[in-house]
UniProtKB/Swiss-Prot annotation:
PANTHER family, per database record: CELL DIVISION PROTEIN ZAPD (PTHR39455:SF1)
The encoding gene: zapD
One term under GO cellular component: cell division site
Organism per entry: Vibrio vulnificus (strain CMCP6)
Xref: InterPro entries: ZapD, ZapD_C, ZapD_sf
Subunit field text: Interacts with FtsZ.
Protein name stated in the entry: Cell division protein ZapD
Family in the record: Belongs to the ZapD family.
Subcellular location: Cytoplasm
Domain of life: Bacteria
GO biological process: division septum assembly; FtsZ-dependent cytokinesis
Keyword line: Cell cycle, Cell division, Cytoplasm, Septation
Amino acid sequence: MTTHNFEHPLNEKTRIYLRVESLLRQAHTAASFSEPHQHQLFFRSIFDLIEIFEQIQLKSELAKDIEKQRLLYRSWLNVEGVDQATLRSLLDEADRTHAALMQAPRFGQSLKEDRFLSSIRQRFSLPGGSCCFDLPALHYWLNLPIERKIEDARQWLDSLKPLSDALNLWLKLAREAGHFRSQTALNGFFQSDAEEANILRLHIPMEYGVYPMISGHKNRFAIKFINFETGQACSQDVHFELAVCS
């Protein structure tokens, strides 16, 4: 059975984390520059990340979240019934990630100070603004050897490695905290309580031809399935898999 997978954040912090994860993934995928116009996706992702960093103290939020995990793991040390080898491995990873995060400069600072990136950032956001007559410096860079472009991209992305490592760890732990269970949306509607949840994860069979519209917060949520072809609320029962991740 073919399914499409969907994630929905239940608080603003997690919403930002998922957006940053998506932008980092896009930037890494496009950094090979193996296809025409991949530079568009790469630079747009980088500039979107810079804009988020300018608005939110992401480093301090992530540091607090990783620290909470470290304290939780330490409370489980020597507790009977807990796999101590796995626990110590997770604690070591959390310790390393937290230390690297605390030593890192403010996220995106080196990107903002990069002469080339700063020279193209403003015009890049204009509709069609990446034409050679708008951004001659970008046009020159695009004609550099592929090895040079890949190396530049690697250096820019490496400056975000402490962020990427911390974010990947927190999201991995959050996702693994939830377990998929079979659910049924009666007449295309489902609602439930959630205790301090961060993310909803859904596996929805494609055969229904629907996508979810989700509203809610960390303690309660509702899912309404919408028919893709009509844009109207689905009136049939939808069987799907749901994980509520705290």
